[in-house]
Amino acid sequence: MTEATLSVYAAIRSRRDVRAEFDGTVVDDDTLRRILGAAHQAPSVGNTQPWDFVVVRKPDTLSAFAAHVADCRQDFADKLDPERRQTFDPIRIEGIETSGTGVVVTYDPNRGGLHVLGRDTVDDTGLFSAVLAIENLWLAAIAENVGVGWVSFYDEAYLTELLDIPAPVRPIAWLCVGPVESFQEVPDLERFGWRTGRPLDDALHFEQYRRS
């Protein structure tokens, strides 16, 4: 393997969903642009590039979204049984304000017109394309020693209104992006006992899906 190949694998292994590790500084514009450039180079069905990136840095917007996320997190917590709630409570949904930068990735289902090459029978390939851009962004951020935290505790209609996103464009991810003090060795959900990762062999099938 070349050094570059090893670096790719190292980035994948060290990728973490960052919450409490942001150092309070803001990622500089040049670095952010390199990271977004990597995201924009992701593969996409029919070369439609159905994503857009909304960079959010205004403190009032960050604060408003953080408050909304806290409410959504509480709603989820209230649905848990006592034992599961005890495991969940230490898991914080932080980083919206301390990262100083939110990158909202959107998906435009109309990008590319009515007939998109490769999307005719599997419509979700458009959405999958936008998610590939997120993965590119995340790995590029790791290479820059920049953390990313994917926030999914939000109401889509609220975020659409907050950022004045036109229909039918959808916000599919709010990513907290910023320099970090360090990356955790063990993913948070494993550290706090919420869920452990599956071994590759459990996910690997040959020729047909193996029923357990």
Enumerate the language-model features and the residues they cover.
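Short acidic N-proximal helix/loop "leader" segments that mark the beginning
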Residues: 1-34
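C-terminal helix-cap and adjacent tail motif
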Residues: 2-4, 11, 18, 90, ...
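Short alpha-helical scaffolding segments that buttress acidic/His motifs in well-ordered protein cores
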Residues: 12, 35-39, 175
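Glycine-rich phosphate/pyrophosphate-binding beta-alpha loops
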Residues: 43-46
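Glycine/small-residue-rich phosphate/adenosyl-binding loop
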Residues: 49-130
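A glycine-rich helix N-cap at a beta->alpha junction
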Residues: 73-81, 93, 164-188
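Short secondary-structure boundary segments
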Residues: 107, 153, 179
